[in-house]
Each structure stands twice: as C-alpha cells, then as structure tokens.
A protein has these predicted regions:
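C-terminal motif of bacterial Sec signal peptides marking the signal peptidase cleavage site
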Residues: 2-3
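Right-handed parallel beta-helix
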Residues: 38, 64-70, 91-101, 113-126, ...
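Solvent-exposed, polar/charged alpha-helical surfaces in well-ordered, non-transmembrane soluble domains
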Residues: 26-33, 118-119, 194
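Short, conserved catalytic or interaction motifs in soluble domains
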Residues: 6
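Extracellular beta-strand/beta-solenoid scaffold signature
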Residues: 28, 50-51, 77-85, 101-108, ...
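Right-handed parallel beta-helix/beta-spiral solenoid domain characteristic of secreted/periplasmic
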Residues: 9-26, 60-103
Length: 225
C-alpha cells in the first residue's frame, strides 16, 4: 500500500530493564528535605546512580524499597558527602533496599531514638579493599535500635557497627568480608543473636574505648555463627 514504507515499526520494549529517571537523585533528596512526620518514601525497584550523599533530619519517616536486591542505591560515582545516607532523626525506619559502594560509611544514623533497620544490604561490590568505606550499617549515640535481617559486605572497618548506644538488638543478619563483622562499642544493653558473621578478620567484637561519652555494659551474644 502507498505510504506503508514510510511508517516506523513499533518499538520493542524490554520489560526486564528498569528505566530510571535522570533526575531521580534530585527528587529523592527533595523528598527527604520536605518530608513530614509519618511520611513513607517508597523507592521502586531499580538501580539508581547517586553522586552526592543523602541526608534526613525529619522525625517519623520511613524509607522503603522493593527488596534489598531490587532497589539499589549505587554511590559508585559519588563525588561529595561523607556517607551514602546520613540520618539524624527519631522514629526512623529503613527497609528493603541496598546501599552500594558509598564513598564513606554506607548508612550512618546519629543521635536518634527508635530506629528500625530491616532487610537492608550495604556492600562494596569490588570486594574487600582498604579504600572501601569504613562502616556499612553504623548507628551511633542511638537509643532503642533494631537491626534485623540486614546484610553487610566489604566494609574496610566494620560491617555492622553500633557505638555509644542504648537498648540495641542485632538479629537474623549476615556480615561477610569486613574487617570486623559485627562490632558493639561503648553500648548498654545490646542483644546480638541469630547472626552469621563469617569471612571477616574478626567475627563479633564487644569492647569499650576510653575517653568516649559512655562506657558500655550488659551485652549478650548468643546463637551466632
């Protein structure tokens, strides 16, 4: 038929490929800055390249992905920021996502109360390296913190590090190929159980460092591998 040769064939869409908007990073940081207590920030499945560290300082926010192997925040080309994600807020939950290849610490939570870190993976994908960030999951000076079903791989210091905190549970988690798998430092009332800490220089460490804001006590460690 006349004119048929000029028509373009319909595009073939590969549904297995995630299409990520170019301005995702700007949108996500804006959501974090403008969040209100009670907000849930949902991040769909996909691998998202981020170039600057993220931060949250609003209480009562949940960040939720589609799964630790489905929603991936990749900081491989990070050019600014000391962490992948820095949180200085109370009543915070993060779950079902991964933070990869952060320039510094992957997930740092500082001076926060009532924190849940669940089904989060932190990883440096190039394998063990002294140039990797120091800490994977890093709550410091927190109170009432649950770390559950997380995975921490490849930190140049500790995969899961809890410092100067009170009332902490670390359970059902896996730490591999870090210098220290799980480290509890200067912390009161921590329970560490049902975890796997293998292929690290040290598996699970508990100690007090001098000249810090508090000395720790009453850490219980049981049923770990």
């Amino acid at each position: 038929l006349a004119g048929c040769a000029d028509q373009e064939a319909p595009a073939v869409v590969d549904e297995s490929v995630s299409v990520v908007e170019v301005d995702f990073e700007t949108q996500l940081q804006l959501q974090l800055l403008e969040a209100k207590p009670g907000d849930v920030i949902d991040i769909p499945a996909g691998t998202y390249a981020l170039y600057r560290g993220l931060s949250l300082s609003v209480d009562g926010v949940t960040i939720r992905g589609a799964g630790m192997d489905k929603t991936i925040l990749s900081f491989k080309e990070q050019v600014s920021g000391a962490e992948g994600l820095l949180v200085t807020a109370n009543d915070f939950t993060i779950e079902d996502l991964a933070i990869e290849d952060a320039k510094g610490d992957a997930l740092k939570i500082n001076e926060s109360k009532n924190v849940i870190i669940r089904r989060v993976r932190t990883e440096w994908t190039n394998g063990p390296d002294t140039a990797n960030g120091a800490y994977g999951i890093y709550p410091v000076q927190t109170e009432n913190t649950l770390i559950d079903e997380v995975v921490a791989i490849g930190a140049s210091d500790a995969g899961i590090y809890v410092g100067q905190s009170k009332n902490v549970v670390v359970r059902n988690s896996r730490a591999e190929y870090n210098v220290a798998g799980i480290e509890i430092e200067n912390t009161f009332d921590a329970d560490v159980f049902d975890n796997v800490a293998i292929n690290n220089t040290g598996g699970i460490l508990v100690f007090n460092m001098p000249n810090l804001s508090q000395e720790g006590a009453r850490t219980r460690i049981f049923r770990n591998l």
